[in-house]
C-alpha cells in the first residue's frame, strides 16, 4: 500500500487559497497558513464556505515558528482557528509542544514534532508515538540528518500510523521511508518548503511506477 502524497502549498496571501483547485490530484493538500501575517490568518473564517468543498483533501497547518514556521501567530488566535477547524471536521497539524500547553483536540488529526539542532533518542520519540498514535490520524516525526538519524527513524516505521521525515537534501530518502511504511510523504505544490522535497506530481509518478513494477512482477 503506497503512502498518501501530500502537496504542501504556502499561503502567502489569503487569495492563494483559490489555488487549491490546481492540486486536487494529490492525495492531500497542506495549507501552510503560517506564511500569512496574523491579520490575514484571522480572515480564514471568511473562506470556510469555499474550503468546505475541498476539506476531505486538506491539511491545515499553522506551524509554530520554533518548529519551522514562517510567521509566529498569537496562541489565542491559533487556538480559536484550531477549534473552528475541529468543529468543521478539517484535518489539521498540531505540534506536540502546543498540545503540552493547551487542551486542543487531536483525535484523527496530525500530531507533529520537529527537531532541527539535535537528534532525540529513539526512546523519547517512541514515548511521543505511544502517547498520541492511538487517537491521532498520524504522528509525524521530523529529524535532521545528523549522525545516527536513520537508527532513530527506521524503527518508528513499525508503527501503523506514523509519518517520518528525514530532513536531508537527499530526496530519495523521503521516497524510501514512504516505501517502508511512512503514512504520509510530503512534497511541494509550487516551491520546496523544506529540504529534500520533490514536486508532488513527480512523487506520484514515482510511486505509480513502483506500483506498476510490483504488480507486473506478481503477474509474471
Swiss-Prot record:
Molecular function GO labels: 3-dehydroquinate dehydratase activity
Pfam families (UniProt xref): DHquinase_I
Function text: Involved in the third step of the chorismate pathway, which leads to the biosynthesis of aromatic amino acids. Catalyzes the cis-dehydration of 3-dehydroquinate (DHQ) and introduces the first double bond of the aromatic ring to yield 3-dehydroshikimate.
Domain of life of the native organism: Archaea
Classification via SUPFAM superfamilies: Aldolase
Binding residues annotated for 3-dehydroquinate, in chain numbering: 8, 30-32, 63, 174, 197
The encoding gene: aroD
GO biological process: 3,4-dihydroxybenzoate biosynthetic process; amino acid biosynthetic process; aromatic amino acid family biosynthetic process; chorismate biosynthetic process
Active site, renumbered: 114, 140
Record's catalysed reaction(s): 3-dehydroquinate = 3-dehydroshikimate + H2O
Keyword field: Amino-acid biosynthesis, Aromatic amino acid biosynthesis, Lyase, Schiff base
EC number: 4.2.1.10
Name of this protein: 3-dehydroquinate dehydratase
Pathway assigned in UniProt: Metabolic intermediate biosynthesis; chorismate biosynthesis; chorismate from D-erythrose 4-phosphate and phosphoenolpyruvate: step 3/7
Subunit record text: Homodimer.
Family listed: Belongs to the type-I 3-dehydroquinase family.
